[in-house]
């Protein structure tokens, strides 16, 4: 994950100081891209521990169209706790937009099912896209989507994915986002009988929070290790039937966790 450390170092060195919604303050840079060849290893950061249950269960939660944190909490995942209301609800966030986007006729559109169909039947399409940025529902969301838009691309029997992330917490959030969408690409490729290609991460406002500066220094002092590999143990009937136990991250060797506060 040298690409990630290079990114972290660049923003630390040339980013500009900005205030932000959380009143924490950030060092920020606008626009960056990283490319990971998924056939050469699974892009999990090794210079600190990435909590894999959070990555996997959150993705399954998105795919289920769920927007209540009970499922996450039942599986030991707490990353959405701070934004939920007293009933555990988050409003029409990712799960709703991925699986139940409402059109002007108030009909529900399942974007995930649609892209699976497109990858299988019209792989050369330039419209294999999922968007979570529903302008008409932003005000009802506990937190507007940070990773807002992703597109699939098929060439030479390989499936690639590019994500656009409008707001990128580089130290805490981006390692999770890279892992999550890389996992989704593997799942989609398996469902569509393709090999994996590249995962491309593209960021808008890429920032390091001011209360993460010490943690960033610690991480940059560490040497990245060889990447893990992903083993998917079975092929379910569809993209929605995977479970946590279906995934094994082989030879994930990592340094100690580095704790940091989340900006709310």
From Swiss-Prot:
The keyword Iron does not apply. NCBIfam families: PRK01827.1-3, PRK01827.1-5, thym_sym. GO terms for molecular function: thymidylate synthase activity. PANTHER family: THYMIDYLATE SYNTHASE (PTHR11548:SF9), THYMIDYLATE SYNTHASE 1 (PTHR11548). This is Thymidylate synthase. DUMP binds at residues 21, 126-127, 166-169, 177, 207-209. Catalyzes the reductive methylation of 2'-deoxyuridine-5'-monophosphate (dUMP) to 2'-deoxythymidine-5'-monophosphate (dTMP) while utilizing 5,10-methylenetetrahydrofolate (mTHF) as the methyl donor and reductant in the reaction, yielding dihydrofolate (DHF) as a by-product. This enzymatic reaction provides an intracellular de novo source of dTMP, an essential precursor for DNA biosynthesis. GO terms for biological process: dTMP biosynthetic process; dTTP biosynthetic process; methylation. The lineage of its organism: Bacteria, Pseudomonadati, Pseudomonadota, Gammaproteobacteria, Candidatus Pseudothioglobaceae. Its main location: cytoplasm. Its EC number is 2.1.1.45. Transmembrane segments: none annotated. Keywords: Cytoplasm, Methyltransferase, Nucleotide biosynthesis, Transferase. It comes from the Bacteria. Pathway: Pyrimidine metabolism; dTTP biosynthesis. Belongs to the thymidylate synthase family. Bacterial-type ThyA subfamily. InterPro entries: Thymidate_synth/dCMP_Mease, Thymidate_synth/dCMP_Mease_dom, Thymidate_synth/dCMP_Mease_sf, Thymidylate_synthase, Thymidylate_synthase_AS. It is found in: Cytoplasm.
């Amino acid at each position: 994950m040298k690409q990630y450390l290079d990114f972290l170092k660049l923003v630390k060195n040339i980013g500009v100081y900005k205030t932000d919604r959380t009143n924490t303050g950030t060092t920020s840079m606008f626009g960056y891209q990283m490319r990971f060849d998924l056939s050469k290893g699974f892009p999990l950061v090794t210079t600190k521990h990435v909590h894999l249950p959070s990555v996997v269960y959150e993705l399954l939660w998105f795919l289920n169209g769920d927007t209540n944190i009970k499922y996450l909490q039942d599986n030991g995942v707490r990353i959405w706790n701070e934004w939920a209301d007293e009933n555990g609800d988050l409003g029409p966030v990712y799960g709703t937009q991925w699986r139940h986007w409402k059109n002007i006729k108030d009909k529900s559109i399942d974007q995930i099912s649609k892209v699976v169909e497109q990858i299988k039947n019209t792989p050369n399409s330039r419209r294999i896209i999922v968007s979570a940025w529903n302008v008409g529902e932003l005000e009802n969301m506990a937190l507007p989507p940070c990773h807002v838009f992703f597109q699939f691309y098929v060439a030479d029997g390989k499936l690639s994915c590019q994500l656009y992330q409008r707001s990128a917490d580089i130290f805490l959030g981006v390692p999770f986002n890279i892992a999550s969408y890389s996992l989704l690409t593997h799942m989609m490729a398996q469902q569509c009988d393709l090999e994996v290609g590249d995962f491309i991460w593209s960021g808008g406002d890429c920032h390091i929070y001011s209360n993460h500066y010490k943690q960033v220094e610690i991480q940059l002092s560490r040497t990245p290790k060889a990447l893990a590999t992903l083993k998917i143990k079975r092929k379910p009937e569809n993209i929605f039937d995977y479970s946590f136990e279906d995934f094994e991250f082989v030879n994930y060797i990592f340094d100690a966790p580095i704790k940091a506060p989340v900006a709310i």
